[in-house]
Amino acid sequence: MQERHTEQDYRALLIADTPIIDVRAPIEFEQGAMPAAINLPLMNNDERAAVGTCYKQQGSDAALALGHKLVAGEIRQQRMDAWRAACLQNPQGILCCARGGQRSHIVQSWLYAAGIDYPLVEGGYKALRQAAIQATIELAQKPIVLIGGCTGSGKTLLVQQQPNGVDLEGLARHRGSAFGRTLQPQLSQASFENLLAAEMLKTDARQDLRLWVLEDESRMIGSNHLPECLRERMTQAAIAVVEDPFEIRLERLNEEYFLRMHHDFTHAYGDEQGWQEYCEYLHHGLSAIKRRLGLQRYNELAAQLDTALTTQLTTDSTDGHLAWLVPLLKEYYDPMYRYQLEKKAEKVVFRGEWAEVAEWVKTQ
């Protein structure tokens, strides 16, 4: 039976997006997994818990016997069919369990007996996780340029267009503000960190990377937080600030938060439920900053939001949203960002409109 692995191999697996057949229980997979992993467990959560209890009370031999008893007959055959199909679909893939121990070896031996010679990750998920953490620590040491600017400045798009850019918000599946959620649920913290490590490794491998281009983010992006090693480096980084006209920012925000989000919700849920989800999304975003706005101002903006939604529903026009978006930017988001930027003014090395900043970044 094949085996792979040195420290460099773990990184190579992440860079290549090697399919990983992860045989850990679903609860383990949800807590943290590699980006290209699919979960086809040897034992489900209940079976794993029962075997774990048996191990503590009666030892490893009894636990192993119980595991074979629980995963037998039709259950074993169903799981074998799933593993066989996954192996045939992903001939360059690899098996993985928690530490490269019994679970992946058992599945590997069963597959081998069925005529499929399939490798496994020595050290399992734990080894891959440590490789991901170490890669982030090392790669974060390269110089960083941050793209700053008020809400609607097109910072994320600018980062996405750079060969040395890493879209932190895209990886976190959140745009970082009260209105930042997307239709994709956020990953667990460990899975987010693994995805970030893989993206940094792939970006670094594609070129002779001298510096990173990242968006000027706070520590938290929705429910995910940036790894401390990267966050610390970002606090020391140079900042290029996008200063686009207010009207252009409004156009971007209209496209991103009204037109696109409405489209995405209706595409996912259908017209009627999609509309309700879209309305709830906007109200939830405004409600999240109610305390900072003050109750009176919040109620005024919420009423304007309701009016704008009625107009959008009846006319398809999103223009009515300007009635609450403009004051929200001028009274809340813009002053907040300018205050934050003032605290790190000495880090600002360039200011300009979007195209000017994009051109400047290329020269770095």
From Swiss-Prot:
Q: What class of enzyme is it?
A: transferase
Q: Which reaction does it catalyse?
A: 5-methylaminomethyl-2-thiouridine(34) in tRNA + selenophosphate + (2E)-geranyl diphosphate + H2O + H(+) = 5-methylaminomethyl-2-selenouridine(34) in tRNA + (2E)-thiogeraniol + phosphate + diphosphate; 5-methylaminomethyl-2-thiouridine(34) in tRNA + (2E)-geranyl diphosphate = 5-methylaminomethyl-S-(2E)-geranyl-thiouridine(34) in tRNA + diphosphate; 5-methylaminomethyl-S-(2E)-geranyl-thiouridine(34) in tRNA + selenophosphate + H(+) = 5-methylaminomethyl-2-(Se-phospho)selenouridine(34) in tRNA + (2E)-thiogeraniol; 5-methylaminomethyl-2-(Se-phospho)selenouridine(34) in tRNA + H2O = 5-methylaminomethyl-2-selenouridine(34) in tRNA + phosphate
UniProt family annotation: Belongs to the SelU family.
Q: What functional role does this protein have?
A: Involved in the post-transcriptional modification of the uridine at the wobble position (U34) of tRNA(Lys), tRNA(Glu) and tRNA(Gln). Catalyzes the conversion of 2-thiouridine (S2U-RNA) to 2-selenouridine (Se2U-RNA). Acts in a two-step process involving geranylation of 2-thiouridine (S2U) to S-geranyl-2-thiouridine (geS2U) and subsequent selenation of the latter derivative to 2-selenouridine (Se2U) in the tRNA chain.
Domain named Rhodanese: residues: 14-137
Q: Which GO terms describe its biological process?
A: tRNA wobble uridine modification
The UniProt entry, under SMART domains, shows:
RHOD (SM00450)
Active-site residue list: C97
Name the keywords, alphabetized. Selenium, Transferase
PANTHER family from the entry? TRNA 2-SELENOURIDINE SYNTHASE
**Protein known as:** tRNA 2-selenouridine synthase
The domain of life is Bacteria
Question: What does the subunit section of this Swiss-Prot or TrEMBL entry state?
Answer: Monomer.
Note the Gene3D superfamilies from the entry: Rhodanese-like domain
Q: Which InterPro entries match?
A: P-loop_NTPase (IPR027417), Rhodanese-like_dom (IPR001763), Rhodanese-like_dom_sf (IPR036873), SelU (IPR017582)
For this protein, the Enzyme Commission number is 2.9.1.3
One function term, GO molecular function aspect: tRNA 2-selenouridine synthase activity
